[in-house]
């Protein structure tokens, strides 16, 4: 009998666990004697490990040599190096002479590795990440290399499977759940889906069609891994997540698989695919498949229906847990692992289609990303991750005890003590208190995220009053017309018959009649809430009419109904904004994607500055493939709409003053123009190369710039403003050609660039239009070239431009593009506007232009006043300012410092051209008029008011006009 060193001390163990460990040590010593094994020392952690894992002890007793090997190779004391697990599995597979040998040796390898993993975990050497990673690696390499081995066996008999073009085909294995997320637990089964790229047949003497080939491969692979032999199993294989579950074929080709998810895919399958990952076989083909499935998993819109679907799934789990008395289930019970996963994955299902930063597999990276994106508070994420790690360690230790796939807390005192001891506690009570604390926090956060919809929550709490019930019955049509009208009148609707008519038209209309059962259910949940919210508005009737229009437009897209049902905040903000502005109501109706912005008032009423806008748009566009111009155009439109909504919301609530409103709207346009120019330029560079030329014999790369005129140039954009822009380039000299394979003359290149920019800005897509673009202020107007060279622009302004074109130049500035051209344009502008002019002739030309505008556009109704065009309005002020600049800039160059009217008026005072009193009056009046126009735009009204409203200001403006423009007095 081989001698063994003295037994290790059992002092670290609770008294109740020592007898069992003594028996295990007795059995191990007998096994060593039986197999002629000698240990020169007992591993220090053996007592702690065997106290927590009878499974690890039994393997060592059955095969002492496995423990000896692990001691000798040092892997009980160190983590595996990169590639080491793969090499261990490969050595077993390569040495296998036949299937029986492979089955045996894989199982022995599994015993050895599971003993090592349990040892390092229970001894405290390995953290959770290492344990989960090693378990995942073991499973993944066993699946991958076993699949390759079976493939080779089948090829010998039937030949290589090929598609119609003769390309070889391999099985693709998708790992689902915790395997896909690299979070496999100790005794987990592996959830797999088998697929392959294309139909065809094998090229051998006994050919099979590819479907049969891969079915046989899958069946043999499952047997290799799953069958329970004298040595146990490698991994239990669960194929129930495949399309149609147990009733479906074991293997599907890509087209059939994609077709299934497009036609039959359910919410829980989207949830399952979040973590899906190619774990074996043809990984490149598998990655292509995952890209194809991404739109099913991650919807491009914000999918708030995911809340309801996950809530239903969790309710089903809770019912099943209750039926099986699983209150002590750390995975499925309340406050358990599944609730943590649901929290993170709900945000993924809802948002990851729009924001690929959330397209992650592991739950902890997802939670951390949510904190980074400020979608969840940092302290909540910290609590969830801490709880998750504690629960996962508990789950692993439960399973390490006997290598059983259990998630339930033990019932016997001894088993409870073992678990508590393995988790670092001296007794069950201490462990139980810590567990309860973590589960309570998880449950609280879960309930906050998955709170029942507003109506359901009231009902569940017994708080639903008769008002809510009555409104629900009105929507359902359960009350007669008179009774329904009486209720609506009592609720606050002034024209109850009309309100009822709107409700009935919506209920009986085509949009609602064609709803799916899910859509109808969500609409039925929303409408009583919406009626109650509208009744509480300042103008219930107007709000209801606007909300009904919006609901009709979104009814077939139940995700938006879900958003309003799920979020009291979103519904509250919707009512507030629809009450305040039909323009905002129409914006939301046309672009319901914007409803997501209503969830967070902190963001909704806080428009970004220019730097923030630029960073935000860069982030948005970085998530789109560079060659997907269609999606780029949609993202640009969505960005612009979101930012304009924020400005309008802040404006309507009085958060932003007038000048800031125009600043923000102008910044949005500038940022959009910069990105559109950059995107289109890159597209044309890829196709034609970069423009080149020789100037004075030196190589030069010409640039391109966008010049903003009018309200864009003057930083005075309104909500409905179009963009007056002019395109310039600075190509000159010789050899003006692009350097690509499809070379173009530079003038043609820049013309195409300008055309493409106009197209991107002005084309309607499914996401709407960016801006209406007007390029008629370019040299020679609509008959001139779309894009001019800087030299040609300079020559035109100096020799051919009309006075009205110089007036327009007053409010012009570079807004995007090449800095060198911007400097050149600024110099041309200063020189042209600074020319000394005949003031009498200038005054006559400006006056004639103003009279022409008035005759063509002014109001003919003396009881009405067009704020923009009528005498005494904005146009008079702008024309006077332009006259003063053109008349006096020769003597006072500071008048050319700015392109906007307000700062020019300030300069007119500083230079002594205009009395301060007149400048102050014009400034205040100009702001009042513009502010009123903003208000009218948000009410979807023309810029026309009652003539009496601004009578005094209007008359004073006309008096100034007569004094300056007719009498020639300053």
From Swiss-Prot:
PANTHER family hit by this protein: BIFUNCTIONAL GLUTAMINE SYNTHETASE ADENYLYLTRANSFERASE_ADENYLYL-REMOVING ENZYME, GLUTAMINE SYNTHETASE ADENYLYLTRANSFERASE
Top enzyme class: transferase
This enzyme's EC code(s): 2.7.7.89, 2.7.7.42
GO biological process, alphabetically ordered: regulation of glutamine family amino acid metabolic process
Cofactor: Mg(2+)
Region Adenylyl transferase, annotated ranges: 468-970
tRNA processing as UniProt keyword: no
InterPro entries for the chain: GlnE, GlnE_rpt_dom, NT_sf, PII_UdlTrfase/GS_AdlTrfase
UniProt record similarity statement: Belongs to the GlnE family.
Keyword terms: ATP-binding, Magnesium, Multifunctional enzyme, Nucleotide-binding, Nucleotidyltransferase, Transferase
Described function: Involved in the regulation of glutamine synthetase GlnA, a key enzyme in the process to assimilate ammonia. When cellular nitrogen levels are high, the C-terminal adenylyl transferase (AT) inactivates GlnA by covalent transfer of an adenylyl group from ATP to specific tyrosine residue of GlnA, thus reducing its activity. Conversely, when nitrogen levels are low, the N-terminal adenylyl removase (AR) activates GlnA by removing the adenylyl group by phosphorolysis, increasing its activity.
Renumbered residue ranges of the record's region Adenylyl removase: 1-454
GO MF: [glutamate-ammonia-ligase] adenylyltransferase activity; [glutamine synthetase]-adenylyl-L-tyrosine phosphorylase activity; ATP binding; magnesium ion binding
One GO cellular component term: cytosol
Name this polypeptide is given: Bifunctional glutamine synthetase adenylyltransferase/adenylyl-removing enzyme
Catalytic activity: [glutamine synthetase]-O(4)-(5'-adenylyl)-L-tyrosine + phosphate = [glutamine synthetase]-L-tyrosine + ADP; [glutamine synthetase]-L-tyrosine + ATP = [glutamine synthetase]-O(4)-(5'-adenylyl)-L-tyrosine + diphosphate
């Amino acid at each position: 009998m081989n001698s063994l060193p003295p037994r290790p001390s059992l002092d670290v163990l609770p008294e109740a666990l020592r007898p069992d460990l003594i028996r295990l040590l007795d059995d191990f010593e007998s096994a060593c004697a039986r197999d002629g094994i000698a240990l020169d020392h007992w591993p220090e952690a053996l007592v702690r490990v065997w106290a927590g894992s009878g499974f690890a002890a039994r393997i060592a007793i059955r095969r002492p040599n496995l423990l000896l090997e692990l001691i000798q190779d040092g892997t009980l004391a160190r983590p595996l190096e990169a590639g080491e697990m793969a090499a261990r599995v490969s050595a077993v597979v390569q040495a296998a002479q036949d299937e029986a040998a492979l089955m045996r040796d894989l199982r022995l390898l599994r015993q050895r590795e599971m003993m090592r993993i349990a040892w390092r975990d229970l001894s405290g050497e390995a953290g959770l990440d290492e344990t989960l990673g090693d378990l995942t690696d073991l499973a993944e390499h066993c699946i991958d290399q076993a699949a390759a081995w079976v493939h080779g066996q089948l090829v010998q008999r039937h030949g290589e499977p090929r598609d119609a073009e003769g390309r070889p085909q391999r099985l693709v294995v998708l790992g689902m759940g915790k395997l896909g997320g690299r979070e496999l637990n100790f005794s987990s089964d592996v959830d797999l889906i088998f697929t392959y790229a294309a139909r065809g047949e094998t090229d051998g003497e006994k050919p099979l069609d590819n479907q049969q080939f891969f079915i046989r491969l899958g069946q043999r692979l499952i047997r290799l891994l799953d069958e329970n032999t004298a040595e146990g199993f490698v991994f239990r294989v669960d194929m129930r997540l495949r399309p149609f579950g147990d009733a479906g074929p074991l293997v599907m080709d890509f087209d059939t698989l994609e077709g299934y998810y497009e036609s039959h895919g359910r919410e829980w399958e989207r949830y399952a695919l979040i973590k899906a990952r190619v774990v074996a076989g043809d990984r490149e083909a598998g990655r292509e498949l995952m890209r194809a499935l991404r739109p099913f998993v991650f919807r491009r819109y914000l999918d708030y229906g995911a809340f309801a679907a996950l809530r239903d799934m969790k309710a089903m789990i809770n019912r099943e847990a209750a039926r099986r008395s699983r209150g002590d289930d750390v995975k499925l019970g309340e406050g358990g692992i599944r609730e943590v996963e649901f929290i993170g994955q709900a945000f993924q299902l809802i948002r990851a289609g729009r924001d690929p930063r959330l397209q992650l597999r592991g739950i902890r990276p997802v939670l951390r990303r949510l904190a980074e994106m400020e979608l969840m508070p940092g302290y909540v994420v910290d609590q969830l991750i801490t709880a998750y790690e504690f629960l996962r360690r508990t789950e692993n230790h439960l399973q390490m005890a006997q290598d059983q796939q259990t998630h339930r807390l033990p019932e016997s005192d001894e088993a409870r003590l073992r678990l508590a001891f393995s988790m670092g506690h001296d007794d069950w009570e201490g462990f139980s208190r810590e567990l309860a604390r973590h589960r309570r926090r998880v449950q609280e956060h879960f309930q906050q995220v998955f709170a029942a919809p507003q109506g359901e929550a009231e009902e569940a709490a017994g708080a639903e009053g008769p008002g809510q019930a009555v409104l629900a019955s009105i929507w359902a049509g359960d009350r007669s017309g008179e009774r329904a009208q009486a209720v609506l009148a009592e609720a606050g609707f002034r024209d109850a018959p009309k309100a009822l008519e709107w409700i009935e038209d919506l209920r009986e209309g085509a949009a609602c009649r064609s709803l799916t059962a899910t859509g109808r259910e969500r609409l039925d949940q929303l409408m009583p809430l919406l009626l109650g919210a509208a009744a509480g508005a300042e103008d219930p009737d107007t709000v209801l009419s606007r909300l009904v229009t919006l609901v009709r437009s979104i009814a077939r897209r139940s995700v938006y109904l879900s958003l309003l049902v799920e979020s009291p905040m979103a519904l509250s903000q919707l009512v507030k904004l629809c009450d305040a502005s039909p323009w905002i109501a129409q914006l939301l109706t046309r672009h319901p994607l914007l409803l997501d912005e209503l969830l967070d008032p902190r963001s909704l009423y806080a428009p970004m500055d220019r730097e923030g806008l630029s960073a935000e748009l860069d982030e948005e566009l970085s998530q789109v493939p560079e060659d997907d111009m269609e999606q780029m155009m949609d993202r640009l439109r969505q960005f612009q709409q979101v930012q304009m909504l924020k400005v309008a919301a802040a404006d309507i609530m009085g958060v932003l003053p007038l000048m800031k409103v125009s600043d923000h709207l102008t910044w949005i346009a500038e940022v959009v123009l910069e990105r559109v120019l950059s995107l289109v330029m890159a597209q044309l560079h890829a196709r034609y190369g970069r423009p080149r030329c020789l100037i004075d014999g030196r190589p030069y790369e010409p640039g391109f710039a966008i010049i903003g005129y009018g309200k864009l140039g003057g930083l005075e954009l309104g909500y409905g403003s179009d963009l007056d822009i002019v395109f310039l380039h600075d190509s000159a000299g010789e050899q003006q050609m692009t350097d690509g394979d499809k070379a173009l003359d530079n003038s043609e290149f820049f013309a195409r660039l300008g055309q493409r920019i106009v197209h991107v800005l002005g084309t309607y897509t499914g996401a709407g239009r960016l801006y209406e673009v007007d390029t008629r202020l370019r040299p020679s107007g609509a008959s001139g070239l779309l894009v001019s060279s800087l030299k040609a622009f300079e020559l035109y302004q100096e020799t051919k431009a009309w006075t009205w074109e110089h007036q327009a130049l007053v409010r012009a500035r570079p807004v995007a593009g090449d800095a060198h051209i911007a400097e050149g344009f600024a110099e041309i502008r200063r020189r042209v506007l600074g020319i000394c002019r005949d003031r009498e002739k200038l005054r006559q030309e400006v006056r004639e232009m103003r009279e022409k505008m008035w005759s063509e556009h002014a109001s003919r109704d003396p009881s009405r006043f067009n704020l923009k065009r009528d005498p005494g309005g904005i146009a008079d002020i702008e024309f006077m300012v332009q006259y003063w600049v053109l008349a006096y800039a020769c003597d006072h160059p500071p008048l050319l410092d700015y392109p906007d009217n307000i700062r020019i008026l300030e300069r007119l005072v500083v230079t002594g051209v205009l009395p301060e009193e007149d400048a102050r009056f014009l400034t205040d009046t100009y702001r009042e008029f513009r502010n009123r126009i903003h208000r009218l735009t948000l009410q979807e009204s023309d810029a026309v008011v009652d003539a009496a409203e601004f009578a005094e200001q209007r008359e004073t403006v006309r008096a100034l006009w007569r004094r300056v423009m007719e009498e020639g007095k300053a």
